[in-house]
A protein has these predicted regions:
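Short glycine-rich substrate-engagement loop in P-loop NTPases that contacts/grips substrate
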Residues: 6-10, 43-76, 87-92
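Conserved catalytic/switch belt of AAA+ P-loop NTPases
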Residues: 84-131
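C-terminal alpha-helical "lid" subdomain
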Residues: 124-185
Length: 185
């Protein structure tokens, strides 16, 4: 679905593949921020698929996490889901990982967050986090595509659009619940 992320994805890929990042073996950190259901995970999957790199998913703290990441002697993507929860007490550890001082090879760090309240040391240095993408309401194209793919009775399309239009926040989760309800009744 069209989540309005193509420009961001292309920019990230171009940066990752640039001579500066390749030759200097630089890590790249990005943040996808927004409430649940706005497309952060989908965007992460799209980016991972396009780069064709192994993906390490981190969703909880671990005592030897930095040692493990530093031991990886190949380029990879490190996806840290809900980073503000995963590293709630250990943001210094997160900084050390992204800095990559001891890395054998470069890493692309994707941090998803529901609330962007990470340490200023993380956000204040462009060498750590290069891009931040805010996810909000679904685009009209994403809404139409989802309805087209999932609504059984297409005559009820305008009814769903009316409900979605009245919402303050529209997410994939909310849209799915509405379409499911209409499909049931």
């Amino acid at each position: 679905y069209d989540l309005g992320i193509e420009d961001t994805i292309e920019k990230i890929i171009k940066t990752w593949k640039s001579d500066l990042y390749v030759n200097d073996k630089k890590n790249l950190g990005i943040i996808f921020n927004g409430i649940k259901g706005t497309g952060k995970t989908i965007a992460s999957k799209i980016l991972c698929n396009r780069l064709h790199l192994p993906v390490i998913i981190i969703n909880q703290e671990s005592a030897n996490l930095i040692d493990f990441i530093q031991s990886l002697e190949f380029e990879c993507i490190v996806l840290i889901d809900e980073a503000e929860k995963t590293f709630k007490n250990e943001q210094e550890e997160l900084l050390k990982m992204i800095d990559g001082v001891y890395n054998a090879s470069r890493k692309l760090y994707i941090l998803t967050t529901n609330e962007l309240r990470l340490d200023d040391n993380l956000l204040g240095r462009p060498g750590r986090i290069r891009y931040i993408k805010e996810f909000g309401n679904l685009t009209i194209n994403a809404i139409n595509d989802y309805i087209q793919d999932n609504l059984i009775d297409k005559n009820k399309r305008s009814q769903i659009l009316e409900v979605v239009d009245s919402l303050e926040i529209s997410t994939i989760d909310i849209l799915k619940a509405i379409v499911d309800e209409v499909n049931v009744h």
